[in-house]
């Protein structure tokens, strides 16, 4: 229902958390501990840090597992933004309750508006690189100068005539970035710069 647009991210996460019923925090933490990042993400971060390229993680998921995954790989130093979740007790039943501190009234689909984070943290002369794969990335990519896309985001970029580099994992992103830097082609995209300018004017 979320992928079809019938419900948005706030409704989807709220329904998913409610469906968990009585939650045992330790069991949930064990499950999260079994999950992992793209194996090529830590080397990609190291590459970016060597080249003085800041990395920020934007997730429309929940903070407790984002934080867990970053700590698992020693990447908790990275700035990141996600929806919040906490355990609450209700008549002896422990439930996972989500909240959405970064929701935007201008964004109907997402719980964590990635577009707003991009605009708030960038300067006029910055060149923005965006890596994404899903529905929550759609509102952000038009503001990015360099876009890496896979899965659902490829189809969206194609439908909106947004240029992009296709990738399978962060090994592909790193390899492409190496070529872009070697060739001196890390330059602003005119349409993205105009979109950012229009957004700032509208604010």
Language-model segments: which ranges?
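Non-catalytic pre-domain segments flanking phosphatase-related domains
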Residues: 24, 190-203
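Anion (oxyanion) recognition and catalysis
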Residues: 49, 71-74, 122, 142, ...
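Acidic, Mg2+-coordinating phosphoryl-transfer loop and its flanking beta/alpha structural elements
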Residues: 59-60, 124-166
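Short, acidic/turn-prone active-site loops that include or flank metal/cofactor-
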Residues: 82-87, 152-156, 169-173
